[in-house]
Amino acid sequence: MTVKTPVYLDYAATTPVDKRVAEKMIPYLTETFGNPASNSHAFGWEAEEAVEKARADIAALINADPKEIVFTSGATESDNLAIKGAANFYKTKGKHLITVKTEHKAVLDTMRELERQGFEVTYLGVQENGLIDLEELKAAIRDDTILISVMWVNNEIGVVQDIPAIGEICRERKIVFHVDAAQACGKVPVDVEAAKIDLLSMSAHKVYGPKGIGALYVRRKPRVRLEAQMHGGGHERGFRSGTLPTHQIVGMGEAFRIAKEELEQDMAHYRKLRDIFLKGIEGIEEVYVNGDLEHRAPNNLNVSFNFVEGESLIMAVKELAVSSGSACTSASLEPSYVLRALGRNDELAHSSLRITFGRMTTEEEVQFAAELIKSKIGKLRELSPLWEMFKDGIDLNSIEWAAH
């Protein structure tokens, strides 16, 4: 069988909308177009009914009450609403927040903004495997700590933090616990009750739903309070004003309904693809998987190939849509801050590829990707004087390079 290229292996960036989801959305664009807040006629009632059905489907995936789901424009807005909203509401109790150095920018930049407003933030480091040390977390907690934010699944390296254990610590100390679950929903089981989570951010477009829609779970018992960040008509119980986009909400609801129904088979599919890929690149020397392989979402692999420059590798495998672990925008050639936090050196951080599988990925595509990467790595290393020196047994760290 011939594989159609380019092969999409960047499902952590975004996913295609599942055809079943797209079909469900279409009527809400043209026929059932009412405003869900219009409560004086059938157009509004029908739209509201569709929104509430979606709310229930989203709640079901994470074991929440539908009343605890607040619609937003995506996980970035959910992170902002959760962190700024809780910090500002509880600031009379204290102004200390805790998060992790490997969080998504939506959390880190929000924390930085709060620092500018006078809050104090502790950024926890991670161990070599990408997981935080729970003892270190406990030691960082102070009497004035009001919020802890830890992501469930890391977007770059896919590692799964011990969220239930952190939830236990927070509940014991009466600290608000926020979790960014954009990469977790539909990839690993998520249960806000079992994990004692207070605030949880979700996104539709990582789960085969449309872009531009997300949700924030806000616990009711024990009740968590937030200060709204968007003011207007008081929609979403006052947490988030703005007309609800019925078609997008219906899409998110259907995507989450399917994700709950097919979670087991999706996870088994991802595991199988991951094993095929790892077997396919087995023979390559100096290959490092970034992040813990056990505590990891099954659809994510982040691999560093020593003595190969990440950018040249991406160009060499142009038949694959993958992302480089480094921020390979032309303006920023900084290596990935997540990989640096694992203690990877600049060379390894620069030579990484993030390969993420999805529901639509086939075994043939993964086989093709592994073989292609294997052959290109060989070719790129043949061009590398560093590889030659390494093969000759020269310790590259001991060399004094001439300055220009």
UniProtKB/Swiss-Prot annotation:
Location in or out of the cell: Cytoplasm
GO MF, any single term: pyridoxal phosphate binding
Pathway linked to the protein: Cofactor biosynthesis; iron-sulfur cluster biosynthesis
Subunit structure: Homodimer. Forms a heterotetramer with IscU, interacts with other sulfur acceptors.
Keywords on record: 2Fe-2S, Cytoplasm, Iron, Iron-sulfur, Metal-binding, Pyridoxal phosphate, Transferase
NCBIfam families assigned to the protein according to its UniProt record, in alphabetical order: IscS, PRK14012.1
Species this protein is from: Neisseria meningitidis serogroup C (strain 053442)
Domain of life: Bacteria
Binding of [2Fe-2S] cluster, residues: 328
N6-(pyridoxal phosphate)lysine: modified positions: 206
Gene: iscS
Name of the molecule in the record: Cysteine desulfurase IscS
